């Protein structure tokens, strides 16, 4: 399978993926991000959201979409800071992991969805607001290329069926990368291909009519 598909399964598989099996951010979790340090980060974000709302002319129905919201730590901090933009607006937490969604806060204009595609946006009538994410793009699945004999080739992952390999999976080198990569292929070097991050940015931008 492509390396990107393997990373996707390791992180987000609904049965055995990292997040579905208890992996999380926080002081008692596996890693720490700014929202878990304390409420100050959320207060700063709330002020920035108000600045964006003001710049748009204080529209009613201002919508804040937080992708990869986890258990809602940032949402809690932002809401506690009482930003003016949310007095008549809404804050939508987008989180693909059902285990994390169950721990999110509710009420006070907060709602939750599993994906950006689940937002009720009609074609030609996008949201007015902000789509944001904290440390998401560097946590999306990515492809991997390796330079072999002057050519970038795709790194694949397969099941290790022979008894001499102690790991259940192993990497193999596949076909030449397509489209070609504009980086000199120094023998043995590797580079990530983050096409998923680009797709996410395009999808996020498509949600907004202004913001």
Q: In which residue ranges do the predicted regions lie?
A:
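Class I S-adenosyl-L-methionine
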Residues: 5, 123-211
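Rossmann-like AdoMet
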Residues: 1-67, 71-122, 127
């Amino acid at each position: 399978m492509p390396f990107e598909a393997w990373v996707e399964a390791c992180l987000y598989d609904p049965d055995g993926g990292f997040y579905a099996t208890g992996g999380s951010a926080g002081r008692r979790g596996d890693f720490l991000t700014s929202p878990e340090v304390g409420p100050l980060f959320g207060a700063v974000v709330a002020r920035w959201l108000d600045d964006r709302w003001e710049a748009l002319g204080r529209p009613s129905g201002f919508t804040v979409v937080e992708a990869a919201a986890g258990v809602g730590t940032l949402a809690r901090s932002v809401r506690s800071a009482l930003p003016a933009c949310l007095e008549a607006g809404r804050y939508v937490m987008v989180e693909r992991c059902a285990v994390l969604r169950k721990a999110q806060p509710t009420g006070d204009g907060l709602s939750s969805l599993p994906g950006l595609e689940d937002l009720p946006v009609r074609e030609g009538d996008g949201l007015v607001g902000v789509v944001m994410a904290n440390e998401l793009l560097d946590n999306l699945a990515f492809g991997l290329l390796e330079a072999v004999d002057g050519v970038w080739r795709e790194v694949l992952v397969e099941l290790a069926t022979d008894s001499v390999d102690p790991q259940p999976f192993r990497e193999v080198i596949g076909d030449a990368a397509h489209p070609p990569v504009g980086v000199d292929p120094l023998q043995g070097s590797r580079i990530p291909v983050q096409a998923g991050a680009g797709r996410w940015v395009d999808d996020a931008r498509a949600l907004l009519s202004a913001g």
